[in-house]
Amino acid sequence: MKVKPLRYSRDQAEFDRAIGFIDATFALALTLLVTTLDIDDPGAAFSSLGALNDAVGQQAIAFGIAFAVIANYWLQHHRLIASFTAIDYTTIAVNLFLVAAIVLLPFSTQSVGDPGVEDLPLPTVIMAVNVVLASTLHTLVYVVAVRRNLLSPAPGRGEISYTVVNGLASAAVFGASVPIAYLISPVAAQITWISLIPISQFLGRYGARRRRTIDAA
C-alpha cells in the first residue's frame, strides 16, 4: 500500500513549528554576523575615526553585505511562505538545506572581512559559493512548493519562469565572480557583486512584462 506523504495545513501546529524553526535560524544567522567584527587592539582602534576604519572598515563592509544578503533571503522566504496553504516533509527538508547555507554566511563573511587574507582569492570564493548555494536552494524551495501544489493561488507559467530566473540571478552573478577572483583579483570579484543591482532592476521590469505575456497566452 502506498504511504501518503505527511502534509500539514496552515492551521496545524506542525506548520507553525516548521516555519518558526526556519525563521529562528535566519535570525540566529543575522545575530552571529556581529561576531565577524573583531578588533585586535581596542585602544588603538578607538583613538580616531581613521584608526577605527583601518581596524574594522573592511569587516564592516563585509558585515553590511552579508546582513543585506541574509535579510533579503528572509524577506523573499517570508513572502513565499505567505502563499503556502500547507507544508510537507519534502518541503521542510529542502528548507533545512537552505538554512544550512544561510548559517554558513557568518563564517564566509568573516573570511572575506579578515584584513590578513584580503589579497587571497579563496575567502571571496567561499562567500561566492555560499551565496550560490543559498540562492539555488531558495529557488528550489519555490519549485518544490509549486510542484507539490502547496501555493495559493497557484502561479501561472509566466510567474513561475520569472521567479526562477530572478531567484537564480544571484547565483549567476556570484558564480561568475569565482574565476574573476583567481584570474584578476578578489576585489574585482567583489565589485562584480554590485552588478546584481541593475540586473535585478532589469529583471523586475522586463520580467513583469514577460510574465503577463506568457500568462495571457
Model-derived regions: residue spans:
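Multi-pass alpha-helical transmembrane bundle typical of ion/small-solute transporters
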Residues: 1-217
